[in-house]
Amino acid sequence: MASKKIDRLSFDATLEELETIVHQLEQGSLPLEEALKQFEQGVHLVRAGQQKLEQAEQKIQILLTQADGTEQAVPFQPEQGEE
């Protein structure tokens, strides 16, 4: 998958693709060249995923900034089923 295509993936699709690659690498049945290619692809996916998370964090900060410019600290409270 080309780097530009990775950038277009949603975060969930990026994570799913990364999980597939990790599973393939953990099996240990890929030839060395293919394993290296998959590893490189995984690195690109990790970087893209991190970037998407950083962008989401920035959007949240913008949304939590009050009209007077001060930031409102809102603690994260997971829903009961997510702990």
From Swiss-Prot:
Listed Pfam families: Exonuc_VII_S
Kindly give the InterPro entries that the UniProt entry links to this protein. Answer: Exonuc_VII_S, Exonuc_VII_ssu_sf
Catalytic reaction annotation: Exonucleolytic cleavage in either 5'- to 3'- or 3'- to 5'-direction to yield nucleoside 5'-phosphates
Q: Which Gene3D superfamilies match?
A: Exonuclease VII, small subunit (1.10.287.1040)
Q: Where in the cell is it found?
A: Cytoplasm
Which BP terms from GO are recorded? Answer: DNA catabolic process
GO MF assignments: exodeoxyribonuclease VII activity
Span of the signal peptide: none
Spell out the GO cellular component terms annotated for this protein, sorted alphabetically and separated by semicolons. Answer: cytosol; exodeoxyribonuclease VII complex
Q: Does the keyword Thylakoid apply?
A: no
Which cysteines are cross-linked by disulfides? none
Enzyme Commission code(s) on record: 3.1.11.6
Q: Does the keyword Lyase apply?
A: no
Role noted for this protein: Bidirectionally degrades single-stranded DNA into large acid-insoluble oligonucleotides, which are then degraded further into small acid-soluble oligonucleotides.
How the protein assembles, per its UniProt entry? Heterooligomer composed of large and small subunits.
Q: Which family does it belong to?
A: Belongs to the XseB family.
- Give the protein name, as stated in the record: Exodeoxyribonuclease 7 small subunit
Q: Which gene encodes it?
A: xseB
